[in-house]
Amino acid sequence: MIIKWTPSPNFTVGRKGKKIIAIVDHITAGFMPGCLNWLCNPKAQASAHYLVTRDGRIFQLVKDENTAWHAGMVNRPYWQLYDGTNPNYYTIGIEHEGFPNKDLTEAQYQASLSLHRLLIQRYDIPIDNEHIVGHYRIDSVRKANCPGPKFPWDRLFNDLRKGDEENVVRIKILFEGKELDGFIKDGKAYVEVRKLCEALGLKVYWNDKKKQVEVSK
């Protein structure tokens, strides 16, 4: 995957101490080169970290560690991760060349899929519809069609999860003579909490109210 650095002046240095926790997908409502020029124009007062074009190219306009101006206006949001502060500080913005009523091209989709995978791995972003969202979830009034009805959400999540599963290696963990099922992902070994605790003679209880696992002797 080739990412071309094309700097935009429209950004804020740093992220106000916030951690990147989500990806926000956008549609440009315009074609190249106009959309790229606009995102790099100081008069626009707008930008994104990345732009994915219809021919499959990826441009990076703002460094990940800095704040791009892509989703700062909040209007009737329905997004669980919104914490009352500017979403730009804790999100990565990806623009897609095109219009809300047009499908992404296959080259564009594959490039966007690869970029999502890279960011998910880099920032440990969960693959779900709260951590990967459309702009409309943050501004449901002004940006109701961003990225629009043609954006391939189902396909994107299916492909991302498929790739996530392919990175998992199933293993057996031998614990004091007992064989436990586990798996390796990203160089780390995991085992089911309940099975491990039971092997240790501990009791496991799921507290649904607090949404936490409780372990006792």
Predicted features, each with a name:
Residues 1-87:
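N-terminal catalytic cores of peptidoglycan-degrading enzymes
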Residues 2-6, 13-17, 89, 97-167:
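Basic/polar, cationic surfaces and motifs that engage anionic cell-wall
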Residues 27-29, 62, 119-124, 160, ...:
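Sec/Tat-exported extracytoplasmic proteins
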